[in-house]
Amino acid sequence: TALFLAMHYTSDIATAFSSVAHICRDVNYGWLIRNMHANGASFFFICIYLHIGRGLYYGSYLYKETWNVGVVLLLLTMM
């Protein structure tokens, strides 16, 4: 869904809102693709947070190198 949305989205500050409106109104099933993308991204981050919670529960934070790699991956995912 991200590639399809990127084909129609403009990141310019003057036209960003109108490009989102264009996706929702003029693109066939654009509203559905936008909602699927938003819900999929939210579910992805919920899974990441559950994985972090599992690591906290089982004490994986004691493995400093592994935990630091995970933190870096989380920050890269959020960029």
From Swiss-Prot:
Keywords: Electron transport, Heme, Iron, Membrane, Metal-binding, Mitochondrion, Mitochondrion inner membrane, Respiratory chain, Transmembrane, Transmembrane helix, Transport, Ubiquinone. Heme b b566 binds at residue 51. It holds the Pfam family Cytochrome_B. It comes from the Eukaryota. The chain crosses the membrane at residues 1-7, 31-52, 67-79. GO terms for molecular function: metal ion binding; ubiquinol-cytochrome-c reductase activity. PROSITE patterns: CYTB_NTER. InterPro entries: Cyt_b/b6_N, Cytb/b6-like_sf, Di-haem_cyt_TM. GO terms for cellular component: mitochondrial inner membrane. Binds 2 heme b groups non-covalently. Heme b b562 binds at residue 37. It is found in: Mitochondrion inner membrane. It is a multi-pass membrane protein. Its cofactor is heme b. Heme 1 (or BL or b562) is low-potential and absorbs at about 562 nm, and heme 2 (or BH or b566) is high-potential and absorbs at about 566 nm. Component of the ubiquinol-cytochrome c reductase complex (complex III or cytochrome b-c1 complex) that is part of the mitochondrial respiratory chain. The b-c1 complex mediates electron transfer from ubiquinol to cytochrome c. Contributes to the generation of a proton gradient across the mitochondrial membrane that is then used for ATP synthesis. The cytochrome bc1 complex contains 3 respiratory subunits (MT-CYB, CYC1 and UQCRFS1), 2 core proteins (UQCRC1 and UQCRC2) and probably 6 low-molecular weight proteins. This is Cytochrome b.
